[in-house]
Amino acid sequence: MDVVRRLEQAEYYVDLLFKMIDEEKCPFYSLIIKKKARKKDIERILKLCEKLNEKYVVEKAEGLLLFDALLDQFEKALPHQLEVYETAEALAKQGLFVPLMNEFLRMIAKG
């Protein structure tokens, strides 16, 4: 089997596996697959989210109420395939960086 056929077969299997995923349990992973985001972009975003979440917790404990700079960093770091609201919602639903993502969702909803 040549390389192209093997790649096509692998893509077919991935599509089938994706259909088996419960999107309610893993909405962020589903979003990554649907949008065909690259591994290195997602790894970079997750590292950034860890840092932003830590910063959010500290700033919130200090009494800060405005987190526009954190949202701006998050939004600018997203690959073009991912929309900020959809991504924050998927991360929160999957239980990742929940306080930070909920804050982002509130901020976006307020406009």
Residue ranges and their predicted role:
Residues 3-6, 10, 38, 45, ...:
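Intrinsic-disorder-associated interaction segments
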Residues 74-111:
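Amphipathic alpha-helical binding modules
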Residues 1-31:
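Long, leucine- and charge-enriched amphipathic alpha-helices
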Residues 17, 24, 56-59, 63, ...:
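Short secondary-structure junctions and interdomain/linker hinges
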Residues 23-75:
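Amphipathic alpha-helical interaction modules
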